[in-house]
Amino acid sequence: VTERSGLVGTGGGKGPSGANASLIRGRYVLCKAHNDHELAVVQDGAVLQVDGRIEAVGAYDELARRHPGLDTIGCLRHVVIPGLVNTHHHVGLTPVQLGITDMPLELWLSARLYARQVDGYLDTLYSAFELIGSGVTAVQHLDTMRPAPVSAWPERGHAVIKAYLDIGMRVSYALCIRDQNRLVYAPDEQFIATLPPALARETADWLSKTHFRLEDYETDFLEPMIGAYSGGRENLTRIWLAPINLERCSDELLLLTKQWAARHKIGIHLHFCETHYQKLYAERRFGKTAIRHLHDIGFLGPEVTLGHAVWTTEDDIDLIAASDVRICHNASSNLRLRSGIAPVRRFVERGIPVALGIDEAGLNDDRDMLQELRLVKHLHCAPGLYDEPLTAAQIFRMATENGARSIGFGDEIGSIEPGKRADLVLLDYDRITAPYLDPAISPIDAIIYRARNTDVDTVMIDGKIVFQDGRTTRIDRSETLDRIARSLDVPLQPEEVARRRFVHAIFPHIRDFYVDWTLPKPEPFYAVHAMR
C-alpha cells in the first residue's frame, strides 16, 4: 500500500459479506463532548466504518486485530473528529466578490440586489469546496434566490441540492420566504407612498414580481421537494422551512410554516433579532419583544432554530429556554454587518442548545469553519480575572452535535459512536502542533486555538472520501472555477443593469427610513469597554 500524505489506503476494503469497510486511524479520536469540560477521546484510536455506518470505536491495535485486511485511512500524525456542521449558509460567491462591501443589514440587504446573477449549481459548488476544505460535512443552506414565478422554485432548489450531492455533502435545504415589508420594516404600500412618483411605480412593479400565494408554497414547492429527496441519494438531504424573519413574515405565514412543519415532520430556521432595528420593530409593531410575540402566537417549539438572536433580553432567554428552541450563532456575520454580539454565554448557562453558522462568509471572506470556532472562543470573553469564557468542549459540541440536531441529522451525525454515519475529518496534528506543543494542551484546545483549513487532510462523508490531498475527489475545483469565471466574463444582462439602477435609486430612501429608529442605551450582558 502506498503512503500518501500520511494516509494508508484509499477509502475502503471489503468487510464482512463484501461490505465496503475501512479503519480510520488517528493519534487521537475525538468522539463527543461528555460535558462542558471533557471530551470522549481515544488515544491511538480508530473508527470502524462499514457501508458508511460506524460499527466500532476503540484502540487501533485491537480493531486491526479483529478486522484484518481492511484498508487503514490515517495514522499517528492525525486527529480524527466528527464532521463539522455549518448551520447557517446562503451563497457561493461572497457579496464582496460580487461588488457589495459590508454595511448594516438593513442597507446591505437592498445592496445585495446589485449582485451579478450566478448559476445556482456552480455558485453552490464554489462554497461547497470551501466548506469541505475546512472540515464541514453538513450544511443548512438557506436559499434567498427566489426566481419568479413559484413554479420555477423547484428547479432552483434541485440545482443547489445537486451541487451538494455531486460533491458528496449532506445538506438541509430551505427556500427562504416572506410576504410583507420587503424593502423596509413597514408595509410595502406605506413605503412606496414616500417615494417620488416614477420610483414609486418602478418599486411597485418590482415588488409585484415577487408576490406569491401562501398556499402555493406547500403544494407547488414544499411537497414536491420533500417527495423528490425523501430517503434518496444515500439519505444525504433534508428539506427544511425558512420563513425569513419576523419583520418580513406575517403572523399568517409564520403559523402556516408551523403547520407545514408539523404535517411534514420537518424543522424551521428563522432569522431572528439580528439587529437592533429588528428589536425596535417588534416593540413598535406589537408593544412587546419579538420572542414574546412568537411565544404568544404559538410559534416557538423544539423544531425551531433561531438564527442570530443578538438582541434578546433576559426574559427572552427565559422564554427560549422554556420552549426548547435552538439558536444558531453567526459570529463573523454579526461583526461584519455591525449587528452586535449575541449573548451566547447566557444562552449556554440557561441550557439552550447553540449551533454555529458562517452565514454568507467569515471574517476572511471565506468559509473556514475552524477559524469560526476560534472566533467564537475569543469573542465571548469579558475583562477580569474571574470571568468564565466558553470552553473548547462547549464550542466543539456547538459545531458538531448541536448543529446536526438543528438541521435534521441529529440521529445520524454529530459524534463518533456506533450507529452514527461515518462523517469524519482527519486533521494533520503534526502540522497543528509544530514545532512544539506542551503536552498539557489537550487535542481539542490545540484544534480550537491553532487549526486552520490548511490542516484538513481528509474528509469522509457517509464512509466515502470526498476530500484528500487538498482537493475534492468527485468534482474538479479548477474546472468549476474556470466555468464560473467564464460565465461572469460577459457584459451585464439587461435585467442586471435594471437592478443596479434600481438599487442606486432606492438606496437613499431606505437609509432615510430608519433615521429616527434610535435604540435606547442598552445594558449589555457583558461589557468590553467603558467611557469613564
What do these predicted ranges mean?
Residues 35, 421-481:
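C-terminal cap of metal-dependent C-N hydrolases
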Residues 478-482, 486, 499-532:
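C-terminal regulatory/interaction regions
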Residues 1-66, 78:
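N-terminal metal-binding scaffold of metallo-dependent hydrolase/deaminase domains
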Residues 95-123, 149, 181-212, 276-301, ...:
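Active-site gating loops and adjacent loop-to-helix segments of metal-dependent hydrolytic enzymes
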Residues 153-307:
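Metal-coordinating catalytic core of metallo-dependent amide/deamination hydrolases
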